[in-house]
Amino acid sequence: MAQKARIRLSGTSPVNLDGVCDQVKAIANRTGVSISGPVPLPTKKLVVPVRKSPSGDGTATWDHWEMRVHKRLIDIAADERALRQLMRIQVPKDISIEIVLQN
């Protein structure tokens, strides 16, 4: 059985995330390895409620700040050439990549 690399991408900008996914797919097509994905995983929504008034006096009015974390999952055959090219991808600062090798 051939090894495969499971690539898990996460970030706050879906446009940047899809751009990195397109780069990974282009590398897989160039090197001729099999690819599965990108599979969109559920978006995590982080909500922080804060008081509007700085002193705490007055009516209790609240603001809600929210950050969404988008995730994608890509499986690719663990070819040495493909993995070396994956390491050279220019990744935006708001995107994190996790690569796990599996049997």
UniProtKB/Swiss-Prot annotation:
SMART domains: Ribosomal_S10. GO terms for molecular function: structural constituent of ribosome; tRNA binding. Pfam families: Ribosomal_S10 (PF00338). Keywords: Ribonucleoprotein, Ribosomal protein. InterPro entries: Ribosomal_uS10, Ribosomal_uS10_CS, Ribosomal_uS10_dom, Ribosomal_uS10_dom_sf, Ribosomal_uS10_euk/arc. One of its GO terms (cellular component) is small ribosomal subunit. Gene3D superfamilies: Ribosomal protein S10 domain (3.30.70.600). GO terms for biological process: translation. Belongs to the universal ribosomal protein uS10 family. Part of the 30S ribosomal subunit. Involved in the binding of tRNA to the ribosomes. This is Small ribosomal subunit protein uS10. The gene is rps10.
